[in-house]
Amino acid sequence: MPKMKTHRGSAKRFKKTGSGKLKRSHAYTSHLFANKSQKQKRKLRKSAVVSAGDFKRIKQQLANIK
């Protein structure tokens, strides 16, 4: 059985927290800010936690991330 390899794209997008959850950044933050309200832009700056349904799938891609 070959070794599990870490999906490098996922490794760059997700970070593990101290409690074992996965942090991610929000989408819609690269351009077109004139159409977004100040409140929306402020909320997009903060990081978010990966939902439970996605966590199982992403955890397999991040096999060797401590």
From Swiss-Prot:
**Annotated region (Disordered), positions in chain:** 1-48
A Pfam entry, by short name: Ribosomal_L35p
Q: Report the family membership.
A: Belongs to the bacterial ribosomal protein bL35 family.
**What InterPro entries is this protein classified in?**
Ribosomal_bL35, Ribosomal_bL35-like, Ribosomal_bL35_CS, Ribosomal_bL35_sf
Residue ranges, compositional bias (Basic residues): 1-26
Biological process (GO), any one: translation
The protein's UniProt keywords, in alphabetical order, are: Ribonucleoprotein, Ribosomal protein
**What NCBIfam families does the entry give?**
rpmI_bact (TIGR00001)
PANTHER family cross-referenced by the UniProt entry: 54S RIBOSOMAL PROTEIN BL35M, LARGE RIBOSOMAL SUBUNIT PROTEIN BL35M
Query: Is Transport one of the keywords?
Result: no
Q: Which GO terms describe its molecular function?
A: structural constituent of ribosome
Q: Which HAMAP family match?
A: Ribosomal_bL35
Q: Record the organism.
A: Bacillus licheniformis (strain ATCC 14580 / DSM 13 / JCM 2505 / CCUG 7422 / NBRC 12200 / NCIMB 9375 / NCTC 10341 / NRRL NRS-1264 / Gibson 46)
Q: Identify one Gene Ontology CC term for this UniProt entry.
A: cytosolic large ribosomal subunit
Q: What is this protein called?
A: Large ribosomal subunit protein bL35
